[in-house]
Amino acid sequence: MRHYEIVILVHPDQSSQVPAMVERYQSMIKEKDGKVHRLEDWGRRQLAYSIDKVHKAHYLLMNIESDQGVISELENAFRYNDAVIRSLILKRDHAITKSSLIMQGAEKGKSSSKKVAAEAEASEEA
């Protein structure tokens, strides 16, 4: 079994369907004895350039371990799903389980905003 990194861009109008899509893709992987090592939902983000007159997309990142048959099935599922506007599948040497830089930045942003809010409350009380 090989390790893969998959990035999927979903049409922003279909963002509500993302959890069902993720569940479907995970079940496709697990049916064939594959493993999902990392799954990150980056949310809706601005695209660098418009794709089919769409300027934003819902981003998903998956790191999986599976065989080539599952990857072929996933490619077909992405190709024939109108909600998926782009997908990228990369072969990796090993499983990547730690948070991506985008998620680490989001977590730091949340913690720093909490610190700012706590400092503001402390200064108001003083």
From Swiss-Prot:
Region (Disordered): 104-126
GO biological process: translation
Keywords of the record: Ribonucleoprotein, Ribosomal protein, RNA-binding, rRNA-binding
Gene Ontology molecular function terms on file: small ribosomal subunit rRNA binding; structural constituent of ribosome
Role noted for this protein: Binds together with bS18 to 16S ribosomal RNA.
Family designation: Belongs to the bacterial ribosomal protein bS6 family.
Name of the featured protein: Small ribosomal subunit protein bS6
Record organism: Coxiella burnetii (strain Dugway 5J108-111)
